Amino acid sequence: MLHHVRPYGHGAFVPNRLLEVTPQFLDAALARATSLGFQFASLDQVVAHVRARGDGPPQLAVTFDDGYVDNLEHALPVLRRHGVPATVFVTPGFADRTSTLWWLDLEHAIAASPEVVVDLGTGEERLPCAGDAQRSAAFERIYWSLRSGPEARLRSTIALLAARAGIDTQATVARLCLDWAGLARLAADPLVSIGAHTMTHPMLAKHDAAVVRSEMAQSRDVIVERLGVPVRHLAYPVGDPGSAGSREFAMAAEL
């Protein structure tokens, strides 16, 4: 499961770098997996193989979350070179520019501020951000504190920090995420299939059942309508046990 594929960006304070690899890394990883005897397959093929208890070489599926511009510009040429299929899980809110990449908004707000003032539930805290070490400490403090609480508080707190720092959060989405025309170009490639990644990229386990069901079903339906492609698979945003669990798995299976 991948997110960004793009040339390496220099800088010591890049807390979200774990979400990116370079095109050269992807190229080397695909070549290495092939040399080890893995057979690349689409998610449909992997599911069929598992259900049939198929023999043969182990299968490996490549997936990308969110629908970034670099998936089209940098990842797809590597996939074509190796003939490797992939599934891109799309969040319509990013394509529509109505949802935000809050984890990047937090990074950008801290990078642009000598100090951040934030209330994490116990009153205002002043966190210095004068150097990379202080920025990293501030990011860890804010990120994990907000991740452990209600998602509404996470999003509103980060939106406030971004606004104070002069960060245009919608411009970030427009710069990094494919719009529907770009997604159509990606989906037109025979190596690419499209999956659903919810409407707004929420941590589903933090929401009631009606919201979860709507996020899943509506994202599928909107993608089918806008791109005219089948959508048979769902990726859960964030993906840790605090964001998706047995309830979400059962609801997805029903849809």
Please state what every model-predicted region is.
Residues 1-233, 240-255:
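Catalytic alpha-helical scaffold of carbohydrate-active enzymes acting on polysaccharides/glycoconjugates
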